[in-house]
């Protein structure tokens, strides 16, 4: 169980503690879609 929790923690903590990173990823994704 600890391994699963450790693997899941970064997935849930990253968008919460680093929302600006998620915004950058969204911008890159939309930019990539527009380029394609």
From Swiss-Prot:
One of its GO terms (molecular function) is toxin activity. Amanexitides have a structure closely related to antamanide, a cyclic decapeptide with antidote activity against amatoxins and phallotoxins, and might therefore exhibit the same activity. Processed by the macrocyclase-peptidase enzyme POPB to yield a toxic cyclic nonapeptide. POPB first removes 10 residues from the N-terminus. Conformational trapping of the remaining peptide forces the enzyme to release this intermediate rather than proceed to macrocyclization. The enzyme rebinds the remaining peptide in a different conformation and catalyzes macrocyclization of the N-terminal 9 residues. Residues 1-10, 20-36 form a propeptide. It comes from the Eukaryota. The keyword Ligase does not apply. There is a cross-link at residues 11-19 (Cyclopeptide (Val-Pro)). Expressed in basidiocarps. Disulfide bonds: none annotated. Cyclic nonapeptide that belongs to the MSDIN-like toxin family responsible for a large number of food poisoning cases and deaths. Belongs to the MSDIN fungal toxin family. This is Amanexitide proprotein 1.
């Amino acid at each position: 169980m600890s391994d699963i929790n450790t693997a899941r923690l970064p997935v849930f903590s990253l968008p919460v503690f680093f929302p600006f990173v998620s915004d950058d990823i969204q911008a890159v994704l939309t930019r990539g879609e527009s380029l394609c």
